[in-house]
């Protein structure tokens, strides 16, 4: 995998960091198959703005308040991590938006090539982050393609004094460059 080291974004109103997750471990609490997400019991789950599939390629955004999200993720594949979903944040709190993908098409060398566009929109509609074609995952998968993998960019938000209150929107567009499939994903949280 080719790691992406993202710059630090500092503004007087907020502080975002894109972190690089240098791991792409899989787990089996849900998967995408035949064009839909399935829960741990194998039942189809409907697409949402933050979790959807196109064909057999799936993507999912999850915003968590877990400071130990990386430790929870780095578990054996048979252990399903449990993340606390964050929908609201207050001054001094930190949250993380994780991007997951499943079932990318592999090229002739059995490698995946996934990039993504990242956009974070403040409550007033202005953009805090707008990056295109960020490397999400490139290389060989460690497990089956249908398992769930963590994409490299992780958005880390720390609510600081002066940050605008209201709804912050995160839009990530996953691109399976081998399959030529694009999945737009969106999630939001409220800063109180």
Spell out what each predicted region is.
Residues 7-19:
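Bacterial N-terminal signal peptides that target proteins for export
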């Amino acid at each position: 995998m080719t790691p992406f080291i993202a710059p630090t974004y500092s503004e007087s109103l907020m502080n975002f960091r894109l972190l690089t997750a240098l791991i792409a471990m899989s787990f089996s609490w849900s998967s995408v198959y035949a064009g839909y997400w399935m829960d741990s019991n194998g039942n189809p789950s409907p697409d949402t703005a933050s979790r959807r599939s196109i064909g057999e390629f799936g993507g999912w955004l999850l915003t968590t308040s877990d400071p130990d999200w990386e430790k929870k993720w780095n578990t054996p594949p048979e252990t399903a991590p449990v993340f606390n979903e964050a929908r609201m944040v207050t001054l001094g709190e930190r949250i993380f938006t994780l991007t997951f993908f499943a079932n990318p098409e592999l090229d002739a060398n059995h490698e995946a090539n996934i990039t993504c566009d990242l956009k974070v929109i403040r409550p007033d509609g202005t953009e805090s982050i707008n990056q295109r074609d960020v490397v999400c995952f490139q290389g060989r998968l460690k497990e089956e393609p249908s398992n769930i993998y963590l994409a490299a960019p992780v958005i880390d938000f720390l609510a600081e004094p002066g940050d605008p209150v209201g709804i912050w929107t995160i839009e990530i567009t996953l691109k399976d460059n081998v399959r030529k499939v694009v999945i737009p994903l969106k999630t939001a949280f409220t800063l109180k």
